């Protein structure tokens, strides 16, 4: 019940508010729909503008004639039934509400200016698949969107939005009209390559950066895995090279295993080569005796140290000076002075001792003589066993060759 009352009230408000569109210099007729009783002849026309209400004119009926007073006769006039006639020779009368009041009854007329339309604006966005039609100037307009000669959407507002799907290459026409004019605008839409049509290039740049960073991260991850794998293989190879050679007992066991590797497989033994075998199916078999010599070569003999240099000879001492002659006494004649003795010769320098001979280097051990491998025993094959060349097995597995 409450819903019905609200609906009737809204319907009454809508029916009592009438919008009239008119152009400049076009006569506007506001009809009086009330039946006026001669006993109650008072009737009012009021105006509303910018939420301000003012009394426009007062009318009274005497007999069948309506007489009004208080209005501008150059813009307004009344008929015999008190209907209002407007002469819109300027824009002052537009965007106003004229209220007709009789007793407890009211009706509102809103007069709006009707403008001719301009060419609409049509835009599209390939990223969102959106077409937009926009009104630029006209009033009381209807907008229609036509795609491939078919109306797909319409509105009586100023903006029309439409999302399309499916085809990315078509023709769109935006048509706008009202009661006095009509115009349209056509656009050829081509979104077959959205990457080149993006209007929001920041989103495209964002995705490109994501792809580049992801590729770099994947490349770095693969490089790290490759480097670790190479280091692991290299370390394993170095450990195999630096491992000690097998002893003689192991050599005999290995040679014995090589010569007796032909056997019938047990039911539980798979007819497949050992893992990491260096030989594949149907390949020739080579026998090689492991070398017993160490991998490292014999050290070279140490060189002889150089002989110590001889010390320099000591210098000779200087000769002693001759003593002065003694003075003569007066009666005796003076004797000639004795000659000075010759200086003693310097002793010859001691000869340098001969250098010590180098100790003889230790003789290298004689290399082990090579002995030919033992011949394989001839084992006769049964008639129903096919030759070895047709069997998909590896007879001898050499896990390591030095």
UniProtKB/Swiss-Prot annotation:
<dbReference type="GO" id="GO:0046718">
    <property type="term" value="P:symbiont entry into host cell"/>
</dbReference>
<feature type="glycosylation site" description="N-linked (GlcNAc...) asparagine; by host">
    <location>
        <position position="89"/>
    </location>
</feature>
<feature type="signal peptide">
    <location>
        <begin position="1"/>
        <end position="16"/>
    </location>
</feature>
<keyword id="KW-0899">Viral immunoevasion</keyword>
<feature type="disulfide bond">
    <location>
        <begin position="126"/>
        <end position="191"/>
    </location>
</feature>
<feature type="repeat" description="3">
    <location>
        <begin position="314"/>
        <end position="319"/>
    </location>
</feature>
<feature type="glycosylation site" description="N-linked (GlcNAc...) asparagine; by host">
    <location>
        <position position="137"/>
    </location>
</feature>
<feature type="repeat" description="11">
    <location>
        <begin position="362"/>
        <end position="367"/>
    </location>
</feature>
<keyword id="KW-1080">Inhibition of host adaptive immune response by virus</keyword>
<feature type="region of interest" description="Disordered">
    <location>
        <begin position="319"/>
        <end position="388"/>
    </location>
</feature>
<keyword id="KW-0426">Late protein</keyword>
<feature type="topological domain" description="Cytoplasmic">
    <location>
        <begin position="226"/>
        <end position="402"/>
    </location>
</feature>
<dbReference type="GO" id="GO:0016020">
    <property type="term" value="C:membrane"/>
</dbReference>
<keyword id="KW-1040">Host Golgi apparatus</keyword>
<keyword id="KW-0261">Viral envelope protein</keyword>
<keyword id="KW-0677">Repeat</keyword>
<keyword id="KW-1015">Disulfide bond</keyword>
<dbReference type="GO" id="GO:0039504">
    <property type="term" value="P:symbiont-mediated suppression of host adaptive immune response"/>
</dbReference>
<dbReference type="GO" id="GO:0019031">
    <property type="term" value="C:viral envelope"/>
</dbReference>
<dbReference type="InterPro" id="IPR013783">
    <property type="entry name" value="Ig-like_fold"/>
</dbReference>
<keyword id="KW-0812">Transmembrane</keyword>
<feature type="glycosylation site" description="N-linked (GlcNAc...) asparagine; by host">
    <location>
        <position position="125"/>
    </location>
</feature>
<feature type="glycosylation site" description="N-linked (GlcNAc...) asparagine; by host">
    <location>
        <position position="148"/>
    </location>
</feature>
<feature type="topological domain" description="Extracellular">
    <location>
        <begin position="17"/>
        <end position="204"/>
    </location>
</feature>
<feature type="repeat" description="6">
    <location>
        <begin position="332"/>
        <end position="337"/>
    </location>
</feature>
<feature type="repeat" description="5">
    <location>
        <begin position="326"/>
        <end position="331"/>
    </location>
</feature>
<dbReference type="GO" id="GO:0020002">
    <property type="term" value="C:host cell plasma membrane"/>
</dbReference>
<keyword id="KW-0675">Receptor</keyword>
<keyword id="KW-1160">Virus entry into host cell</keyword>
<feature type="disulfide bond">
    <location>
        <begin position="133"/>
        <end position="174"/>
    </location>
</feature>
<feature type="repeat" description="8">
    <location>
        <begin position="344"/>
        <end position="349"/>
    </location>
</feature>
<protein>
    <recommendedName>
        <fullName>CD2 homolog</fullName>
    </recommendedName>
</protein>
<comment type="similarity">
    <text>Belongs to the asfivirus CD2 homolog protein family.</text>
</comment>
<dbReference type="GO" id="GO:0044177">
    <property type="term" value="C:host cell Golgi apparatus"/>
</dbReference>
<feature type="glycosylation site" description="N-linked (GlcNAc...) asparagine; by host">
    <location>
        <position position="190"/>
    </location>
</feature>
<feature type="glycosylation site" description="N-linked (GlcNAc...) asparagine; by host">
    <location>
        <position position="153"/>
    </location>
</feature>
<feature type="repeat" description="1">
    <location>
        <begin position="302"/>
        <end position="307"/>
    </location>
</feature>
<feature type="repeat" description="2">
    <location>
        <begin position="308"/>
        <end position="313"/>
    </location>
</feature>
<keyword id="KW-1032">Host cell membrane</keyword>
<keyword id="KW-1133">Transmembrane helix</keyword>
<keyword id="KW-1162">Viral penetration into host cytoplasm</keyword>
<dbReference type="InterPro" id="IPR036179">
    <property type="entry name" value="Ig-like_dom_sf"/>
</dbReference>
